[in-house]
Amino acid sequence: MVAPQRRTVMPALGLLASSLCSLLLTANAATVEQHWNINWVPDVNPDGLYPRHVIGVNGSWPPPIINVNASDTVRITATNKLETGVGASLHSHGMFFNRTGYYDGAVAITQCPIPPGQSFTYETLNSPASPADRRKQMGTFWIHAHNNDQYTDGLRSPVIIHPDDPADIHYNYDDDYTVILGDWYHSNYTDLVKNEFMNRKNPTGAEPVPKSGLIYFAHTSNKTSAATYLPGFSENATLPFEAGKTYRLRVINMSALAAFYFYLSGHDMQVIEVEGVDVLPQPVDFLSVAVAQRFSVLVTARNDTDPQNWKLHANMDEDMFDVVPEDLQLNVSATISYPNAPKDKFGPEKILEEYTYFDDLQFVPVNAEPMVTPDAVHRLDVSFDTMSDGENYAAFNNISYVAPQVPALFSAESMGALASNPAIYGPNSNAFVIKHNEMIEVQLFNWDAGKHPFHLHGHHFQVVHKSQDVTSDDPTINPPFNSSQVNPMRRDTVMVPPGGSAYLRFRADNPGAWFFHCHIDPHLVSGLASIFIEAPDVLSDSFLNVPSYIKNQCQAQGIATTGNAVGLNSTSDFDGLAKGPTYLESGWTGRAIAAFTGCIITGLLGLATVVVYGWHSGEEDDDEEEEDK
């Protein structure tokens, strides 16, 4: 086992050295800038089955890797070159954006979409507009589109942040690789949603099933200029190991729907990081990686006298699919290669007879944060239903999310005292107003038959409780709440099992408007989302200092930047806002009575037709008998 580096209280000399080190880090911090022309790239074929056009950057795919140090300032200028009349955006998943929520990238929450031909500069790490005492971030993240299903069509990439302060380096390893997992579709996802998912022909809400699963690798050492993708995908991809070396593997699931079980043949894994939170080393046989989740594991390479290669596995969780097509390869693998091992010589494959429940409460953060009694509790009940228009929608507390026209952040900063009234954000925004610095508990109850990974923007949360089945009397699958926890697991994306629950806690110390949603893309499309309006009494133009071009882009598209969800100074007038779906009414509604009456009339007409036909037929028979006589 590789132990974390333990640290004791430093004497005065150590404190002086630490202060000098911090000054040196500040002096050595770099400004990393990338320019992304977001455009369509033709004939991309990573699964070898079908070439298609995808959304890439600067004419290539996959998009660039962001590989930086924790003290760096990162700016990404995104230019919308899609040439389809559709807006774009980028969300840096897992970043906090303290006092810079307008860089979060969630369309209709923190910004308007980037108009065609225009640019938006995101300061994703250590923005000068953030306070000097902001919380440092390091670990494994990713950046992806947050508009119009565009990340499913390819606009997604790793974000790796390396610690550069010795006090933050808890583990030693020889090299660093990122393992990217993802599902892959052969059609534009917007078309799939329109034609196959949000459609009367799909009243049960069966999600579009991918054509393939992908594995590909990136070399992401802390020599930041060296970040590169390794060649090949899945069975054509190779991860190079050298005997005796220890590697950090950062596993990211960038799928729209698929979850993966990740494991290695012939090698042991120890989890050391979960979504930007270093944890005490925890041996695992496999990882259960839901959409948007990330883990880092340490793996020590073998030192065999007779070297051979080994398989790296990422098996798709078939429970995520309503129907598994016969031609879908669920079990995806790549190669761990060793020098001097014959190319076709492999060690025995590891076989998992079953996938046992993967408990993310088992991980213990290195930097402890105590569990604190919540000041406010919000319960969210997850459900899916066929609505009155014949389509299947998702909902929190029977409200299916409909985005506001005015970004919620701009409503919160412009509506004064009314900003604390959740009604102003729209009747279907699922807005929850939370007070500054309170401890918030979110209780999720999943009444759906499927698993759901939920992501909160702008925060880590503590996962303080999980149940696999809230109706069970078995404490092993429905345990009582453990009130004696001292350092609960923290992350930003949690999987809630079908029929199960999860309790999350976070400190409302980051004023802004933060999206909370299921990260399965079709479920977000169908309305499984809400907004946390955090400390609106703190927000103002002077607090945020929104760059003028951001609001100018809204106004150029005819979108207001002040007022309620439609730009009015009202808590009830939402004229022009798209209306949410309505539930099918039960009982004797007007339509039901009309339909029943129509059925009765149709039945009576049918009966009358039979009687009249029989009467005429009888007369004809009598006439024929008279003629025979």
Curated annotation (Swiss-Prot):
Up-regulation conditions: Expression regulated by iron through the urbs1 transcription factor.
MF annotations from Gene Ontology: copper ion binding; ferroxidase activity
Gene Ontology CC entries for this record: high-affinity iron permease complex
Residues that span the membrane, as ranges: 592-612
Record InterPro entries: Cu-oxidase-like_N, Cu-oxidase_2nd, Cu-oxidase_C, Cu-oxidase_fam, Cu_oxidase_CS, Cu_oxidase_Cu_BS, Cupredoxin, CuRO_2_Fet3-like
Predominant cellular place of this UniProt entry's protein: membrane
Domain Plastocyanin-like: 44-164, 175-338, 401-537
Localisation per UniProt entry: Cell membrane
Membrane topology: Single-pass type I membrane protein
Gene3D superfamilies per UniProt: Cupredoxins - blue copper proteins
Cofactor notes: Binds 4 Cu cations per monomer.
Entry binding sites for Cu cation 1: 91, 455
Glycosylation positions in this chain: 58, 69, 98, 188, 222, 236, 253, 303, 331, 398, 482, 569
Family: Belongs to the multicopper oxidase family.
Protein name: Iron multicopper oxidase fer1
